[in-house]
């Protein structure tokens, strides 16, 4: 619907969604502020409503209602076909891989226990290195899948924008039909019916009495037709926030996926790289200490001095750059981010089911109204 220049960017449905406090009467009131172009359409449609033309009245606005019905079908199909299940599978896979590497395995104290029990510390360290490399490769593949899911969600968001604009167009079209019918109803009630009643009263002619009665019946049917169109418009009013609800859930999910790809995964890789570097440093220090101890055994005369130097060197080298507890906290934050994303997905799935149920009810109501129209005919 065209609007005046000072309100061209303000649509009743947008106001309804943004303010949340607007009720239906406020929306209908704002929609009555038609532009000059819309008023011309209203006048034209109003003149096309011919008194006593029951067939014409029956078909009045049916094209707009049919478009609204087809639009409701499309919305329902989009809700049914939009499947974010693979997104959840990918996120679950990512969480599983992140949890598969335990920072405690990089703790030197645990490595000492392994040495005492299995006598194979070197093999255990190599296994950890290999495991982390394998997990890193798998996370890269999951990252590619998540990026694809994010792009699909963005396409769905754009598609929902188009549907939202279409819904506004249907709302505007129905508002024009309703306004034109109300205008015609007012003219008949205030002008035509009083004239026919006066004529019947003055002439006493039964045909004139019947003509007045027929006109009153026509106005009553016109009022019912207006109500049917208002029901269709109500669908558009209720569909707008439902579209935005689905769209906002998809947007939040896409943002969480992007956060995982651009922040969580690189951070995990960096922290694991640091941990591996520290592990190698600790191994180098251990080797250095062993050489120093052997030298101390061979150089008895300088044993005390060498012992002091070796202990001082070992103490300095044993100091870690990054605490294991810090690494555990970082990984915990990453996992919490993924879990929040899964919660958003579950919330989105619930909202879509709710939207699907409501849309089915609205579609059934509209079909019942159309059937009633046909039966009344």
From Swiss-Prot:
Q: Where is the composition biased (Basic and acidic residues)?
A: 1-18
Q: Which residues form the signal peptide?
A: none
The species is Staphylococcus saprophyticus subsp. saprophyticus (strain ATCC 15305 / DSM 20229 / NCIMB 8711 / NCTC 7292 / S-41)
The family annotation for this protein states: Belongs to the TelA family.
Q: Which stretches does the entry tag as region Disordered?
A: 1-39
InterPro entries for the chain: Toxic_anion-R_TelA
> Which domain of life does the protein's organism represent?
Bacteria
Bias-annotated ranges (Polar residues): 20-34
- Name the record gives this protein: TelA-like protein SSP1345
Q: Pfam family of this protein, just one?
A: TelA
